[in-house]
Amino acid sequence: MTVAPLSTAFRSLVGLGGVFTSAKSFEDNPVLSSRWLNQAGLHAARVTWAHRVAVSRRARLAHLVSAEDRAAFARDGYILKRDFVPDFAALLAEVRSYRTAAREMIQGDTLTRKIALDRAALAAMPALRTLVESEAWRNLLAYIGGMTARPVQFIQTIATHINNSDPDPQTYFHADTFHPAMKAWLFLNDIAGDVPPFTFVPGSHRLTPARLEWERQQALIAAQARDEHTRQGSFRIDAAALAAMRLPEPAQFRVKANTLIVADTFGFHARGPSAAPAMRVEIWAYGRRAPFFPAPPRLPWPFGADSYRPRAAVSAFDPA
């Protein structure tokens, strides 16, 4: 046997193992991208199985949130809380004055900066530590994420129009992956003017027959898609496809500082439009676990370290 067949066989074995994990890249996995397997229902089966598990997980954690919040999430795919932090002024002052190492990434014309909420950061910012250790914060994130394990948490800065490159790819409506996942945003500045709002299609987190068929069709062509994010399993969607699924108009959240949004990012979402340079700063959390097991193990940090560059002694509110 030559080297090439051995390599192909090894990739197929690895790809087969990925079927039972959170693996989502059609470009990198010959099993997930197999047209024959997806015509036979592989992708649709993974999506369906993952959603059944997510429903079960959330049912076990339903006591953590109010009936009103559960109903809002079931209807919309997100929970919104205004004036969330009681002593918001203290938290904001801490974040503004805190300087440390950060990681930055540029996608298109937009910069994303992340400051890790590690032990040192939380020790230096007691009001922020109080927030992320509070039941109000943890319970909402746990319920939508379907897990009580602590999510990945950062101070995140979004700076728009920092160059003359292509548009930010996050401004296109998309689902993060094939299974339910949680993201949270506590906005530290008002989302107004040219500050890009979080945008979400209400109800698009639900696995309807129309959505499942759309997922099946996307899986047949994803590996050859022009869009790299689609090839990597974060499917993009246009207005015509949203309308075909009879989904409502997207909601743009132009909200005041101290507003929390926790959402299931299987739902279609995007970073809203920004016509001029602007900055958005938020406490950002991301929860993702292996989608097929009732007690999911922790997954590695999903974003490639090579896409970020280090930056020393920076504040979340510093310019790009």
Regions found by a protein language model. Name each.
Residues 1-75:
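Fe(II)/2-oxoglutarate
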Residues 67-133, 163-165, 215, 221-222:
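Non-heme Fe(II)/2-oxoglutarate
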Residues 85-88, 159, 178, 191-193, ...:
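Short, solvent-exposed loop/turn segments at secondary-structure junctions
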Residues 182, 195-196, 208-210, 264, ...:
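Short helix/loop capping segments that flank catalytic or ligand/cofactor-binding pockets
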